[in-house]
Amino acid sequence: MSTSAALAPALLPRHIAIIMDGNNRYGKVNHLPKGHGHVAGKDALDPIVEYCVDTGIEVLTVFAFSSENWQRPPSEVTLLMQLLTSTIHEQMPRMDKYRIRLRFIGDRSPLSAELQALMADAEEKTAHFDAMTLVIAISYGGQWDIAHAAKQLAKQVQAGELCADDIDKDLLGRHVQLADAPAVDMLIRTGGEYRLSNFLLWQSAYAELFFTKTLWPEFRAAELASMVAEFAQRQRRFGKTSEQIACAQQFP
């Protein structure tokens, strides 16, 4: 049994987000052919998904391809698109076995029609599964997400359906990606870098941050379990003082 498996459900993060960094460095360190670090990274996802299902995590969101990744060499972008396609195909039996809902977030307009159709089909076929939700962020950026939400509200104002003075953070929050999912409780970045890289900026406003030097292809469920156990020990204050939190816990 993992360290976190015995934790009370109230102590578990409902939503874990992961920046899967370190694939290229893993390939270089292990002298793999160019691009094969990404292949190893694709395979590393499966045990993490299974851990989350077994532990009772509601939502797992992984950063597969950022809006900035389009700037990478065309050959690498092509490989990444191929891997995303194969990942979706390979994940479908797992989604069916564990009753996992598969969702995608991001700007789909630059993606090929074939990939867009595959994503839509996967979402439709798993829409009724409720054991967990796996979200794959493709062509996603946090700034794009917020700007996209703002544009939606601007169109409503322009159409006379909304008064500009009625726009607040709650209304904007209902228009960002994953508005219907729990806010991110725990954000993990592998690979040793200490930055958010434009990932889920709105949704992670009060997330607990975890950084590890472990490269993504070497990231294992045991390390995730240790992080979840540490998460359960942290005091999340959401702007309040520790004394206020302690008082609320004593007199719920």
Language model region names:
Residues M1-P252:
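Flexible, compositionally biased loop and terminal segments
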